[in-house]
Amino acid sequence: MLFLVLLSGLIAAIFSLLDVWYFVRGALVVLKARIQPVVKDLLKEHCYGGIVLPHDLDFLFHMNNSRYLREADFARFAHFTRSGLFQAVRYLGAGMVMAGSTIRYRRSLRLLETFEIRTRLLCWDDKAFYVEQRFVAPKDDFVCAVLLSRQHVIGNSPDKVVQSMCKRKVESPEYPEEVAHWIKYNDASSQQLRAESAVTNSAKDE
């Protein structure tokens, strides 16, 4: 009896302190992607289906803003696994983290509404991959939201990752106009924050 009480307490503590279902679902998404056919075209669009459940809702009974980002995570996990991108990053002893994202909401997703997340690798530079993800309503093919993200490669470079995948050097596609503008915005923001940090540190030294 005592063992069951302690076990229940431990499980309750784990669920209280960790987002357990995020890790469980993420692992299941990757496992499923591993047994699905390999997507050899790195630039091919990948579709990942979803449905709005009660725990996804906000006070207005729409899918809440944070859930879009969460669902986009799972769609990227599936795409990067099936395309071999995750495997290539690990093979090179590198890592990959989200370095920035921008999302634009165009139409709400409601309870029990189905949607597709269409993920595309757009381009890359010497530090990061740039990925677009569209939340599309299958009933009318309307883009309900669009997410642009920067996936920063740590310990290596996107060029080397792609070369490892394709067994040859591959040039990045030309940057779409909106991506080029977004990169400039991020660079300007970084410079501004560095300048503010330098001023703050200088003031502390005085």
Curated annotation (Swiss-Prot):
Q: Which UniProt keywords apply?
A: Glycoprotein, Secreted, Signal
Q: Where in the cell is it found?
A: Secreted
Q: Which residues are glycosylated?
A: 64
Its predominant location is secreted
CDD domains per the UniProt record, alphabetical: 4HBT
Q: Where do the coiled-coil regions begin and end?
A: none
Instruction: Supply the Pfam families for this chain.
Output: 4HBT_2
- Which residues constitute the signal peptide according to the record? 1-26
- GO CC terms in record: extracellular region
Which family does the similarity line name?
Belongs to the THEM6 family.
Q: What is this protein called?
A: Protein THEM6
